[in-house]
Amino acid sequence: MFAQTFKMRGKRTVDFTPVRPRRTLPLLAASVLLIGQAWIADRTVYSGTKDAITWSAVFTWIQRDWPQVAQISTRELAERMAAGNESAPLLIDVRTREEYGVSHLPGAIWAETPDQIASASRERSDRQPVVVYCSVGVRSSKAAARLMRSGRTNVFNLQGSIFKWANEGRPLMANGSAVHVVHPYSERWGVLLDSQLHPPQAEKAMD
């Protein structure tokens, strides 16, 4: 590449050297596109109105963001729990203490923070499967991915988590007794939980 300059009469020298195209605009455009795609993907969780969350959209979101996390169905988990042998997994409830206090899966232990979750998993053999769950599977998929990065194997997320489990009429416990309610997490996410499973106080809060 060489410079080409010309003197125009009565004016300054003009440089016609070819200029490499700047990459700033393409990079900026690509960044905006990626952000836009992520925003659109997240919006697909909602169908129609902001409160109309669908299960299919939630499952798609989880698969998109945590494809490395294996999913276990509520049916398979129930079968493993009933077998009561080495296939019975360690159940970790990663919701808040308040949510866990309303109800949880039988035998599940509560561990909300990353350190608590890691500590709970270390107390069991590496050969024992670990199943984590939350309300619908978003928080627990994130927790499962973190456990896997720490080196833990045989980790699963409960697909649909406690909402789907309860919607199917499967057993729930609280303070050692069977219950039939689940913390709805929030008004928006609570639409995925059958209305008869909402605690009375939660229903009042949503009115």
Where are these regions (language model features)?
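N-terminal secretory signal peptides that target proteins for export/translocation
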Residues: 1-19
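Rhodanese-like catalytic fold shared by cysteine-dependent sulfurtransferases
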Residues: 2, 9, 23-82, 101-128, ...
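Structural scaffold elements adjacent to functional motifs in cytosolic proteins
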Residues: 89-93
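Short, polar loop motifs at secondary-structure junctions
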Residues: 94-99
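Short, surface-exposed ligand- or partner-binding patches at beta-edge/loop junctions that are enriched
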Residues: 133
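Residue-level detector of alpha-helix initiation sites
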Residues: 137-138
